[in-house]
């Protein structure tokens, strides 16, 4: 029943978001991002909160567990990572910032306060632009303002399951460096929120400052939203993108229903924090129970002063940002589709350790340049099709890391392979078989045989030379054989009439397999049409 209720609630809310302009959504985000520095923010403990999960409290120092007399020592690598992200988000980096104490009591915060940057954060006044063409939002362009970025320490983890009623505390995560980013309430549509989260996630991965994983807590998103200017509601416990969007949809519908019932002045007058159960939002606390954090400057940490030269050097070393790369790949000379360009610019972490988008993109661009120089085919789709689709398919199937493939098939060698296809010295179907054979043999040698394959020798060895000149009667006999073996008059009739035009591809596939990929597909298609008398 819960499953049915969740689907009904979120779908209904989605419809209202698009169909109820009288009920204006305003939404802002707070995103906490763990930085993958070598050490923690204020100690020399190893920053490894997840891989050490099997050994609680393993990566901890005296400061992490708050032994009396220990003092914080700022990790400047975290400062540089924060500057890097600030510049990528077009923020104004403050040359003078400070750390403050945010006081509250909880078991996973042994200090009794969190060290953060409340009054003078490291950066302010940034933005991230979303585009209809790239980010799947209704508008052509939407700019989301960023209020500030601040450095702060993470808390430990409280564990409740299978503990006989006890709460266990793991401090491996305590004092891990975080950047908290706070946006302006500029979101007016749930699609904008989804696009922003995905874009920000890809950005921190692209900058190599965080894994950006929502499921592990390396990136955590809180939502602040209101409808028609009523009191703000904060949404927490949002472990993934679908939870974020579904919670917003559900809460939007809940508030719209309250407004329609005339109860808004009573039920939406106070700031409220609500959690997401997976099917509904539930009240956690209201304004009356809001915590007074008693912020104060941390007397043990000096004011952070940055030289302008430091910011300039970080800006100079900043890599090309994903949107810039996307535009480049979709323009001359590459002319990639949006889907293919995103494969080369989006680091989804779903491919494990097989490849990174950075390495894959560099391999594609280098291969493209060498292939173009070799063949003069400036607008060819061959490099994109064979690297993004065929080669990646083999990498994922055989589970071979791209760096190993680059040793076997460097860009210059793969460009030569593509040139053989371009010059009709190797058919596409034979090329697929040959490429898989080469890489599979490489895997079976435990990736130790690094001799560059001789493509022409292999083509001769396996008799893969294409049949460029085939007598018409031979093609006719091949088509007739395929049709006899198929023995499906109804399908053939639908094909000839045009009801099932895709059936021709089915016949072509059978014919190509019988010819071992040696026949030109265009010639074979013409032969089938001639044999069947197809007029369309």
From Swiss-Prot:
Domain of life: Eukaryota
Pfam families: GatB_N, GatB_Yqey
SUPFAM superfamilies: GatB/YqeY motif, Glutamine synthetase/guanido kinase
GO cellular component term, pick one: glutamyl-tRNA(Gln) amidotransferase complex
The keyword Secreted is annotated on this UniProt entry: no
A GO biological process held by the record: glutaminyl-tRNAGln biosynthesis via transamidation
Chief subcellular location: mitochondrion
MF-aspect GO terms: ATP binding; glutaminyl-tRNA synthase (glutamine-hydrolyzing) activity
Function description: Allows the formation of correctly charged Gln-tRNA(Gln) through the transamidation of misacylated Glu-tRNA(Gln) in the mitochondria. The reaction takes place in the presence of glutamine and ATP through an activated gamma-phospho-Glu-tRNA(Gln).
Name of the featured protein: Glutamyl-tRNA(Gln) amidotransferase subunit B, mitochondrial
UniProt lineage: Eukaryota, Fungi, Dikarya, Ascomycota, Saccharomycotina
Gene: PET112
């Amino acid at each position: 029943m819960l499953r049915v209720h969740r689907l009904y609630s979120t779908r209904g809310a989605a419809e209202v978001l698009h169909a109820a302009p009288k009920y204006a959504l305003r939404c802002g985000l707070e995103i906490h991002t763990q930085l993958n520095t070598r050490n923690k923010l204020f100690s020399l403990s190893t920053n490894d909160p997840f891989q050490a999960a099997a050994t609680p409290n393993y990566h901890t120092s005296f400061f992490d567990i708050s032994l009396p007399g220990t003092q914080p020592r700022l990790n400047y690598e975290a400062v540089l990572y924060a500057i890097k992200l600030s510049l990528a988000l077009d923020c104004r980096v403050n040359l003078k910032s400070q750390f403050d104490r945010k006081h509250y009591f909880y078991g996973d915060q042994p200090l009794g306060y969190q060290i953060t940057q409340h009054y003078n954060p490291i950066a302010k006044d940034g933005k991230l632009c979303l585009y209809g063409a790239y980010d799947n939002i209704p508008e052509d362009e939407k700019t989301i303002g960023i209020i500030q970025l601040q450095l702060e320490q993470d808390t430990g983890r409280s564990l409740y399951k299978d503990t006989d009623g006890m709460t266990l505390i793991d401090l491996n995560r305590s004092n891990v460096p975080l950047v908290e980013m706070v946006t302006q309430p500029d979101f007016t549509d749930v699609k904008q929120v989804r696009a922003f989260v995905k874009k920000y996630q890809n950005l921190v991965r692209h900058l190599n400052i965080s894994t950006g994983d929502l499921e592990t807590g390396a990136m955590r998103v809180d939502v602040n939203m209101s409808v028609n200017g009523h009191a703000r509601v904060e949404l927490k416990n949002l472990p993934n993108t679908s939870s974020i969007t579904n919670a917003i949809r559900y809460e939007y519908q809940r508030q719209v229903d309250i407004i329609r019932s005339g109860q808004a002045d009573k039920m939406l007058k106070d700031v409220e924090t609500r959690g997401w159960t997976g099917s509904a939002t539930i009240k956690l606390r209201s304004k009356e129970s809001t915590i007074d954090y008693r912020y104060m400057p941390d007397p043990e940490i000096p004011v952070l002063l940055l030289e302008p030269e430091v910011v300039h050097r970080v800006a100079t070393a900043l890599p090309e940002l994903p949107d810039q790369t996307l535009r480049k790949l979709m323009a001359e000379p590459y002319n990639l589709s949006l889907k293919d360009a995103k494969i080369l610019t989006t680091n989804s972490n779903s491919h494990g350790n097989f490849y990174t988008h950075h390495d894959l993109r560099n391999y594609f661009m280098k291969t493209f340049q060498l292939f173009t120089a070799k063949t003069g085919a400036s607008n060819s789709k061959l490099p994109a099709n064979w690297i993004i689709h065929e080669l990646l398919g083999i990498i994922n199937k055989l589970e071979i890391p791209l760096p190993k493939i680059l040793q076997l098939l460097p860009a210059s060698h793969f460009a030569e392979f593509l040139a053989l296809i371009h010059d009709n010295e190797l058919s596409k179907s034979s090329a697929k078989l040959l490429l898989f054979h080469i890489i599979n043999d490489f895997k079976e040698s435990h990736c130790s045989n690094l001799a560059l394959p001789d493509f022409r020798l292999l083509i001769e060895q396996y008799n893969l030379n294409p049949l460029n000149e085939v007598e018409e009667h031979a093609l006719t006999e091949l088509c007739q054989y395929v049709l006899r073996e198929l023995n499906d008059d109804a399908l053939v009739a639908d094909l000839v009439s045009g009801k099932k035009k895709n059936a021709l591809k089915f016949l072509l596939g059978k014919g190509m397999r019988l010819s071992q990929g040696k026949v030109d597909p265009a010639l074979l298609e013409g032969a089938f049409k001639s044999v069947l008398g197809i007029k369309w």
